[in-house]
Amino acid sequence: MINFDNLYRYQDSLGYIAMQLCFPEKKTFNENIFNEVIDPSHPGYQDLLAFREQMMQYTLSEIQQIYTDTFDFSKKAPLYMTYNQFDTQKERGQMLAKLKVLYEMFGLKMVDNELSDYLSLMLQFLQTIEWRGDERAEENIQLVIMIIEDGTYVMANELGKLNHPYGYVIQALRKTLKLCLQVPEGVALHD
């Protein structure tokens, strides 16, 4: 089940995290945006702060190289959440189609060349979705969050082992999304 109060509370921060997981630009590390969106009570505050502190040691071109090496050339940290989740391309294709329809159902128009399981796109969807009064919201938002949960689990562990800067962003995301779910008793989410 979705904790809609927390989802509403953290929507803007999901957009901020999405920005951190896109190819880095100068505004990616804008301190004013960070301070405006992420306050000390945010569940991922310490992780995002650690990420910023590590990245501030590098130039923008070095950060872009770190990003490319991490996400474009490694199968252990794909930004496509279903990349390692399905046994066949057919199964993955069906999920991609389902996500695309889901986004359109809630008014998000995708760019033609983007896959619907791209993490930043999924977070932008959660940031902008208007669910109030829509009976389809709970099931569909839960699907998106669970795909992100599954897709980031291995990535969080791999990047965490390396003390990789982007590991902090993934941990902040997972902590935030965990609070957006109301987990039934007896069921546990991965940390």
Task: Give the location of each predicted region.
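Charged, alpha-helix-forming regions
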Residues: M1-D191
